[in-house]
């Protein structure tokens, strides 16, 4: 049976009927007797898309249903692979309500074809969310006898009525409709009764709305409508049939509408919005504002030929598609259509990078704005889009970016450059437009609100109004971004829309309860928007808020819930249906209520006037208990795409305030993956769910005590003083120079920012730390890592803020700021600040990672973080932003002080103090940075140790790796780490994670989550059977680092050890720069490990803190009083040369150090048994070699350079022991201050080693070289006629770098020590042999005590005669023992030399009075002691040279092996003569080179005897010395 509609209803307002699978369908079937038998006509033509049609093939119909999961799940089961069928359907379940039947074949799930998918894949797709969109193929459902209504599951429509307007031309007549029936309804009388009641209420509401619309109509029309709509109350009470019979148009409209909104099976969207949109546009409505008026506000069209669209009638989508296609073709057309642009912006913000489009739009506004107003906009465009760290940075050519930057800095107009930048991003924008067009062709345009554009018809007014409505949905999308991105996006959209003239209509006034609730929160919404400042009075706040609303169209939607329709979260089915069902309680609905479009639901679902926070429906499948269903939702729900509508938004606020036992899965999956706190506006919008969720302190922080709330009130942000001049009077500023004004500005900035930083620390304490501690949200250990010493840090900054306030109270002008700065950053205050700050900052990265983990795993902690970070005192900053404020503050201090120094007059005491304070700030920052780095490295080492697997190493037999079977990485300090590739052979490589520790290199192999310590082997060179095993752990004191000549990314680590043959590791970095970093750090670590082989040196007599030298007897001690402890004492060397101090400063330091405590004596046997590290030859340690010879116990494997260093040190110590009485400073009488002293050193070789141009006694320029009596000789110079071999050691550096490359000569003695000591000159005799006299003979000159030492009055010619002249080619000395003892007590009668004297005097200790010679046997004990020292040194030197010989032989074997293989395919076989020779030249010291050459000539000879090895190091002339050791 069919229903004939009256002629007053326009055909164009009708739509296809949705699927009726509820008790409503049962009730509708009873209406079959209401109409006459006039048949409706349908169009025979139909052109439907596959997803929209009902395909009938062999009795089967393809349809689409959308199922919403309820508390029992989806309510059906599936079976089969490839052909997946519905096996069973639960009666009354979600699937049955949606129209799923047993035996239906599933074609698509959520748009994905499943015809080739397995059973498990289909089930997984269906369970991927709370909604499932299924395309089914099955038998056609039974029909109901209602004509004009089509029950197609894929189509849901609502009959629309229009105001009375001139109708368009009628369409052609339609053929009779076909009748398609739906599934049988549920037989529930209560449900039918309830549905009938709802329809009656809707009918009354329609009458009232029509009466409101009728007055503007003509009198005749009004009488006609009243005649049709006058309903007798008695007739209404008698039953619905009579009312429906008299008013068929209204009843059918209600049937259409209620079939969608009241059907319990339609809690989820079961319709395709694309179909609704296109059907609605089949015949465009003329002259009606359909986009603004909801259904119940529109009148009835007086069209003379109303027709309803038949069930099989299709529509012509050409007009709308063509119009939209034209607009969506390029950006120029979009800019002129704001509504279409907002739809495109919704797509961009959901699916693409919004930066290029927003940059283009803002630049467009800039182009059309006058230069005065566009100046600030240009800076905003730079900060948002073009700066290096801009939140929405776009990629434009660097030249354009630099030009824009330059013009903005110079206050020039960058319009032309911005035009070019727009063209640069236009290509990417066009690609985004094409992407959107492709999605439109797939029917996805409705997801972004394109349905709302159907009735615009090119009307600019309606288009502008539609754009205003679309901005609401845009605001919801923006609210899901993080704050640092959402605020710039909001600003950019607001800028263009304001320029385009888009304004929002004033929303209707809310109810009293809403006003009362929203009033206290007004101020809390304002900080969400940029450049909104707090004002002092409430009137100003309200005025600014109103201005913001006018400027920012989005503010009306995201500010606070002004009206019920605006407070609805779009897309929430529960709210929409509940909203509609309770609408009858409002007697007079307002016609201006706006409709919000979600893009994924039919428009009519959203048309309502009010909202209620309760659910009172009790029908089958209703939303009763929906909150419990959502709370119990399991965590397997996968996150929906950002383009999808958030179905759970309205229930989110309730979930935020659940108990601690709520399931973690109830949280939004998106919030778990991206722990961004909700904004204040977003929290406010949720207040529609619970009236008590207003954004106030007692709700957000329910557990804070009253005193805490009082402290929070003290934390209100103070008004930021932008300009110091605004805080003082103009008369004060008028009397100051511009430089002083700038200085006061910087000082004021320091004060204000320090107070702001203190507020930030208090926020951390009150809102986070105190609550976490009171509520036991974190264990004490974790809390101690996150806030280790926060109260101490607050106290430090608070004390300084108080001091600054007192300083400010003294007057508006701060005259001298240096003393407070020094008081804060120097002395004990500096130590306290750097220690507390380092402790606070060290574990921040570890603690923040812990917080992220807890947020993912613990729902209670996640809720707390959301609440706390949403507090207004946090100023939209998250915990991770607040906790790093201390580190950021430390970096600001040097910059602020530098600016103050810049505006402070130089040369004043204040300037010097400020410079010192700045330097101390940098030291504090450096200290904290190092502490943070070490803590992070230690944390990473702990992680590596947990994953370390050394089982393979425990089973290995490699002796090198035996001691590392129980390796503990946490006991060492990590220097560097990173991935490297190990080329084991030509065809085998291995990816490694390499750790560089302070004494080890660890090669870790990744295997899943484990890190393996595993030995690897390869075939040895020259043998096909034997294999060489490589240890994964290398000691740094036994390795060499070399670069690979044929690969700029590779380097060698060569391990030399007594436990096995040399091993070569070829490691390849990712880039050449990485390789350089690795080599630099490795060489430095090798050098440090070589200085301290094995374990750290054990100091025999530890010096007091701060001392750099052993404590001496003071200025009264003489050289005769030297004891064993002084001879053998070693000290901890400095890491590097002190910067800045010259000779004078060094001498002063030594004089101060020399006043320390006496050094205790030790037995010589004990000294011989303890290992020694060679003292540094740098800086201050060079001058004590006569008193600090090194005893190195060769107990472990040593690097070759270490042996060479030690041997050379012994050579120097031996020379000084022999010749100490002849060195400068032991004169017969005291020299006058400032008088230059002649060089008394008898040999050129000694001069060349012990003097340098930068010594105090040598001014640095070359003296007259008429003979060899001068102390100073320029580096590298040599007397004429002198044999090079004689002084071969004279020009050798005392040590080498670990890389094997020899540096320029370094200081061999410490001038400061030389200037602070006293020395007798007659302890024993030294006989010099002159090998060649001027006449050609050989003679000898005996020097005995001080009588043979020439004084300063002797001429150079006399000295030349004694020493054999300048042509002497070599000298040799031997010791002649004195006959009697030497008096060891001399009393001082003078004062130490003045600093000026130190420049001219030699740096050796000087005697304050003339030496009084003593005869006899008084010096026998000293001589015997010195002889023992000499021979002990010679013995140690012999051992070291033997070891050096062995190292040289091992090195030669290593070079031979390198020549025999190509190093994993990178080093050619024939490259030994180049690379090996280069290594030989750079790695061997000159004495070792001579030994190597000698060994090469002798063939298989094992090496020279100890005497020969000693002679190599000691030989200074052509004649053997008398001090050469015996066997």
Swiss-Prot record:
Compositional bias segments (type: Polar residues): 509-519, 1242-1251, 1494-1503
Residues of the PH domain: 973-1087
Biased composition (Low complexity): 19-37, 656-672, 1312-1321
Record PTM: Phosphorylated by MAP kinase p38 (MAPK11, MAPK12, MAPK13 and/or MAPK14). Ubiquitinated by the BCR(KLHL20) E3 ubiquitin ligase complex when previously phosphorylated by MAP kinase p38 (MAPK11, MAPK12, MAPK13 and/or MAPK14), leading to its degradation, thereby restricting RhoA activity and facilitating growth cone spreading and neurite outgrowth.
Coiled-coil intervals, chain numbering: 461-487
Keywords, in A-Z order: Coiled coil, Cytoplasm, GTPase activation, Guanine-nucleotide releasing factor, Membrane, Phosphoprotein, Ubl conjugation
Domain of life: Eukaryota
Subcellular location: Cytoplasm; Membrane
DH domain span: 742-931
Purpose: May play a role in the regulation of RhoA GTPase by guanine nucleotide-binding alpha-12 (GNA12) and alpha-13 (GNA13). Acts as guanine nucleotide exchange factor (GEF) for RhoA GTPase and may act as GTPase-activating protein (GAP) for GNA12 and GNA13. Involved in neurotrophin-induced neurite outgrowth.
Subunit field text: Interacts with RHOA, GNA13 and SLC1A6. Interacts with GNA12, PLXNB1 and PLXNB2. Interacts (via DH domain) with GCSAM (via C-terminus). Found in a complex with ARHGEF11 and ARHGEF12; binding to ARHGEF11 and ARHGEF12 enhances CDC42 GEF activity of PLEKHG4B, and PLEKHG4B, in turn, inhibits ARHGEF11- and ARHGEF12-mediated RHOA activation.
Protein name according to UniProt: Rho guanine nucleotide exchange factor 11
Organism: Rattus norvegicus
Gene field: Arhgef11
């Amino acid at each position: 049976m069919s229903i004939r509609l009256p002629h007053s209803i326009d055909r164009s307002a009708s739509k296809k009927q949705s699927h009726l699978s509820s008790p409503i369908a049962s009730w509708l079937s009873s209406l079959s007797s209401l109409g006459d038998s006039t048949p409706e006509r349908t169009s025979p033509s139909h052109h439907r898309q596959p997803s929209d049609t009902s395909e009938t093939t062999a009795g089967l119909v393809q349809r689409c249903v959308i199922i919403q999961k309820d508390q029992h799940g989806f309510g059906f089961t599936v079976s089969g692979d490839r052909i997946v069928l519905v096996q069973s359907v639960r009666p009354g379940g979600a699937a049955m309500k949606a129209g799923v039947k047993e035996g239906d074949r599933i074609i698509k799930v959520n748009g994905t074809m499943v015809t080739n998918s397995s059973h498990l894949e289909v089930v997984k797709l269906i369970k991927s969310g709370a909604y499932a969109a299924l395309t089914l193929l099955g038998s056609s459902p039974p029909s109901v006898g209602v004509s004009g209504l089509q029950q197609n599951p894929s189509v849901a429509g609502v009959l629309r009525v229009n105001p009375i307007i001139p109708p368009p031309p009628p369409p052609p007549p339609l053929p009779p409709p076909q009748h398609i029936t739906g599934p049988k309804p549920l037989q529930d009388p209560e449900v039918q009764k309830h549905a009938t009641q709802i329809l009656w209420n809707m009918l009354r509401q329609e009458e009232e709305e029509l009466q409101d619309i009728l007055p503007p109509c003509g009198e005749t029309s009004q009488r006609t409508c009243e005649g049709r709509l006058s309903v007798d109350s008695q007739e209404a009470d008698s039953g619905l049939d009579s009312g429906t019979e008299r008013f068929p148009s209204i009843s059918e409209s209600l049937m259409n509408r209620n079939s969608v909104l009241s059907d319990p099976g339609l809690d989820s969207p079961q319709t395709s919005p694309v179909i609704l949109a296109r059907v609605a546009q089949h015949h465009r409505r003329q002259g009606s504002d359909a986009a603004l008026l909801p259904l119940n506000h529109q009148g009835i069209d007086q069209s003379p030929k109303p027709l309803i669209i038949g069930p099989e009638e299709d529509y012509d989508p050409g007009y709308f598609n063509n119009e939209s296609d034209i607009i969506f073709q390029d950006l120029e057309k979009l800019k002129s259509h704001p509504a279409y642009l907002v739809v495109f912006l919704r797509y961009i913000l959901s699916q693409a990078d919004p930066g290029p489009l927003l940059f283009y739009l803002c630049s467009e506004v800039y182009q059309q704005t006058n230069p005065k107003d566009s100046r600030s906009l240009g800076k905003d465009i730079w900060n948002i889009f073009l700066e290096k760290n801009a939140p929405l940075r776009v990629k434009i050519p660097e030249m354009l970016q630099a030009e824009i930057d330059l013009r903005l800095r110079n206050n020039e107009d960058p319009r032309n450059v911005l035009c070019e930048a727009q063209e640069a991003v236009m290509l990417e924008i066009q690609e985004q437009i094409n992407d959107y067009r492709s999605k439109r062709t797939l029917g996805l345009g409705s997801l972004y609100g394109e349905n709302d554009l159907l009735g615009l018809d090119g009307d600019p007014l309606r288009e502008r109004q539609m754009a205003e409505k679309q901005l609401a949905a845009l605001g919801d999308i923006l609210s899901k971004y993080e704050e640092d991105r959402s605020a710039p996006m909001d600003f950019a959209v607001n800028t263009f829309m304001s320029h385009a003239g888009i304004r929002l209509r004033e929303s209707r006034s809310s109810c009293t309860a809403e006003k009362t609730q929203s009033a206290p929160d007004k101020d809390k919404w304002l900080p969400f928007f940029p450049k909104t400042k707090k004002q002092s009075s409430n009137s100003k706040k309200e005025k600014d808020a109103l201005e913001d609303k006018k400027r920012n169209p989005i503010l009306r939607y995201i500010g606070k819930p002004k009206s019920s329709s605006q407070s609805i979260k779009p897309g929430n089915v529960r709210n929409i249906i509940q909203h509609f069902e309770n609408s009858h309680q409002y007697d007079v609905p307002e016609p201006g209520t706006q409709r919000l479009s979600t893009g994924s639901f039919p428009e009519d679902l959203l048309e309502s006037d009010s909202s209620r926070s309760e659910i009172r429906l009790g029908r089958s499948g209703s939303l009763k208990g929906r909150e419990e269903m959502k709370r119990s939702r399991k965590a397997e729900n996968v996150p929906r795409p950002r383009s999808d509508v958030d179905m759970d938004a309205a229930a989110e606020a309730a979930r935020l305030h659940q108990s601690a036992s709520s399931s973690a899965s109830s949280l939004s999956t998106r919030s778990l993956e991206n722990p961004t706190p909700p904004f204040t506006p977003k929290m406010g919008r949720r207040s529609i769910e619970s009236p008590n969720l207003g954004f106030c302190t007692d709700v957000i922080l329910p557990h804070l005590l009253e005193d805490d709330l009082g402290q929070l009130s003290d934390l209100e942000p103070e008004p930021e003083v932008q300009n110091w001049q605004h805080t003082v009077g103009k008369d004060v500023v008028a009397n100051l120079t511009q430089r002083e004004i700038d200085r006061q500005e910087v000082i004021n900035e320091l004060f204000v920012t320090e107070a702001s930083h203190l507020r930030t620390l208090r926020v951390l304490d009150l809102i986070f730390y105190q609550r976490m501690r009171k509520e036991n949200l974190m264990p004490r250990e974790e809390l101690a890592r996150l806030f280790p010493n926060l109260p101490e840090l607050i106290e430090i900054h608070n004390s300084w803020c108080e001091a600054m306030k007192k300083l400010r109270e003294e007057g508006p002008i701060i005259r001298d700021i240096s003393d407070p700065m020094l008081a804060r950053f120097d002395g004990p205050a500096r130590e306290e600040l750097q220690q507390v700050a380092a402790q606070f900052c060290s574990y921040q990265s570890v603690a923040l990672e812990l917080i992220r983990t807890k947020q993912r795993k613990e729902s209670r902690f996640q809720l707390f973080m959301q609440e706390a970070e949403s507090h207004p005192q946090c100023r939209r900053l998250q915990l991770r932003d607040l906790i790093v404020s201390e580190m950021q503050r430390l970096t600001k201090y040097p910059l602020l002080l530098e600016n103050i120094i810049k505006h402070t007059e130089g040369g004043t005491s204040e300037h010097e103090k400020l410079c010192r304070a700045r330097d101390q700030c940098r030291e504090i920052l450096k200290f904290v940075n190092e502490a943070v780095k070490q803590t992070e490295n230690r944390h990473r080492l702990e992680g590596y140790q947990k994953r370390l697997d050394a089982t393979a190493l425990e089973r290995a037999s490699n002796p090198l790796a035996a001691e590392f079977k129980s390796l503990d990485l946490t006991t060492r300090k990590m220097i560097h780490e990173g991935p490297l590739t190990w080329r084991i052979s030509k065809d085998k490589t291995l990816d490694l994670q390499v750790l560089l520790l302070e004494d080890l290199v660890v090669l870790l192999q990744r295997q899943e989550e484990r890190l393996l310590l595993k030995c690897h082997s390869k075939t040895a060179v020259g043998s096909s059977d034997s294999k060489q095993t490589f240890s994964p752990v290398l000691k740094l004191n036994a390795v060499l680092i070399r670069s690979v000549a044929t690969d700029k990314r590779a380097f060698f680590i060569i391990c030399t050890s007594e436990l096995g043959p040399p091993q070569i590791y070829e490691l390849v970095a990712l880039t050449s720069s990485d390789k350089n970093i690795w080599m630099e750090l490795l060489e430095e670590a090798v050098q440090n490990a070589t200085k301290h082989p094995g374990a750290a040196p054990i100091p025999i007599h530890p010096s007091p803190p701060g001392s750099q030298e052993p404590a001496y007897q003071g200025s009264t001690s003489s050289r005769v009083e030297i004891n064993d402890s002084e001879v053998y004492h070693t000290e901890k060397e400095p890491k590097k040369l002190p910067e800045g101090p010259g000779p004078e400063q060094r001498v002063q330091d030594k004089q101060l150090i020399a006043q320390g405590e006496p050094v205790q004596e030790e037995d010589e046997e004990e000294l011989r048994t303890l290992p020694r590290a060679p003292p540094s030859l740098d800086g201050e340690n060079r001058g004590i070699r006569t008193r600090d010879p090194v005893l190195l116990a060769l107990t472990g494997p040593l690097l070759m350079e270490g042996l060479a260093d030690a041997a050379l040190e012994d050579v120097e110590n031996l020379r000084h022991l022999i010749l100490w009485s002849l060195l400068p400073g032991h004169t017969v009488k005291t020299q006058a201050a400032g008088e230059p002293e002649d060089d008394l050193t008898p040999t050129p070789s000694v001069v060349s080693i012990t003097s340098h141009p930068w010594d105090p006694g040598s001014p640095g320029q070359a003296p007259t070289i008429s003979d060899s009596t001068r102390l100073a000789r320029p580096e590298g110079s040599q007397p004429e006629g002198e044999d090079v071999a004689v002084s071969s050691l004279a020009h050798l550096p005392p040590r080498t770098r670990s890389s094997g490359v020899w540096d320029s000569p370094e200081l061999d003695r410490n001038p400061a020590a030389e200037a602070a000591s006293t020395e007798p000159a007659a302890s024993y005799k030294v006989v010099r042999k002159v090998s060649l006299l001027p006449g050609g003979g050989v003679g000898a000159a005996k020097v005995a005590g001080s009588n043979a030492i020439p004084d300063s009055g002797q001429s150079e010619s006399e000295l030349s005669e004694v020493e054999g002249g300048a042509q002497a080619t070599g000298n040799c000395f031997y010791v002649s023992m004195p006959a009697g003892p030497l008096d060891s007590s001399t009393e001082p009668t003078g004062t130490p030399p003045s600093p000026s004297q130190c420049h001219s005097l030699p740096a050796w200790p000087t005697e304050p009075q003339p030496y009084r010679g003593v005869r006899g046997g008084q010096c026998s004990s000293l001589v015997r002691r010195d002889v023992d020292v000499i021979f002990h040194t010679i013995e140690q030197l012999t051992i070291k040279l033997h070891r050096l010989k062995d190292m040289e032989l091992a090195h030669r074997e290593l070079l031979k092996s390198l020549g025999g293989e190509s190093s994993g395919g990178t080093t050619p076989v024939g490259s030994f003569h180049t690379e090996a020779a280069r290594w030989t030249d750079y790695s061997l010291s000159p004495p070792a080179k001579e030994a190597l050459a000698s060994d090469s000539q002798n063939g298989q000879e094992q090496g020279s005897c100890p005497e020969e090895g000693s002679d190599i190091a000691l030989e200074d002339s052509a004649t053997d010395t008398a001090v050469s050791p015996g066997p």
